[in-house]
Amino acid sequence: MSAPQVGVLALQGDTREHLAALREAGAEARTVRRLDELNSVDALVIPGGESTAMSHLLREFGLLEPLRARLAEGMPAYGSCAGMILLATEIADAGVAGREALPLGGIDMTVRRNAFGRQVDSFEEDVEFEGLDGPVHAVFIRAPWVERVGPDVEVLARAGGHPVAVRQGKMLATAFHPEVTGDRRVHRLFVASLS
């Protein structure tokens, strides 16, 4: 069986780190910036960055509606931090009208942006992660948390009493950045779900 073709949305954020993590996890990974690139992948990673800026860039690059359509059709996706925000069906504090973060609707959840605080409030913490042996060292940078999950959403990890990792079918999202730690278990979990 050939390796899954996984794209990393390369408009902003930890693109290189996700590409490296996906390759180490056994995927064939490449960047996605254009519609033809989006249409050529089996799954997509939406990296961290700034969710309102990423929404703006998705519109500018003509990817917003095609990406929503691919997700609605069942394309697997993994979102970290801002990627988690964008994969939500609802964003609790989307931002200023006209420059707000736009939900893509992949996971039935409500997410609050910057819920753990501003940049200076960023932190690291070991979290227990359902389905993985041992804790995951989680790096939270202006991180969101999940305020509501739908009935088909599994909560995989919590921090501060709030869900910070969730899965719905072949959609995975984390409020933290596993791509920057060298621990590839979250990426391996996502890649394994593609087979």
Swiss-Prot record:
The active site is at residues 81, 177, 179. The keyword Magnesium does not apply. Pathway: Cofactor biosynthesis; pyridoxal 5'-phosphate biosynthesis. The lineage of its organism: Bacteria, Bacillati, Actinomycetota, Actinomycetes, Mycobacteriales. L-glutamine binds at residues 49-51, 113, 141-142. Its EC number is 4.3.3.6, 3.5.1.2. One of its GO terms (molecular function) is glutaminase activity. This is Pyridoxal 5'-phosphate synthase subunit PdxT. It catalyses: aldehydo-D-ribose 5-phosphate + D-glyceraldehyde 3-phosphate + L-glutamine = pyridoxal 5'-phosphate + L-glutamate + phosphate + 3 H2O + H(+); L-glutamine + H2O = L-glutamate + NH4(+). In the presence of PdxS, forms a dodecamer of heterodimers. Only shows activity in the heterodimer. The keyword Lyase applies. PANTHER family: PYRIDOXAL 5'-PHOSPHATE SYNTHASE SUBUNIT SNO (PTHR31559), PYRIDOXAL 5'-PHOSPHATE SYNTHASE SUBUNIT SNO1-RELATED (PTHR31559:SF0). GO terms for biological process: glutamine catabolic process; pyridoxal phosphate biosynthetic process; pyridoxine metabolic process. GO terms for cellular component: cytosol; glutaminase complex. Belongs to the glutaminase PdxT/SNO family. Catalyzes the hydrolysis of glutamine to glutamate and ammonia as part of the biosynthesis of pyridoxal 5'-phosphate. The resulting ammonia molecule is channeled to the active site of PdxS.
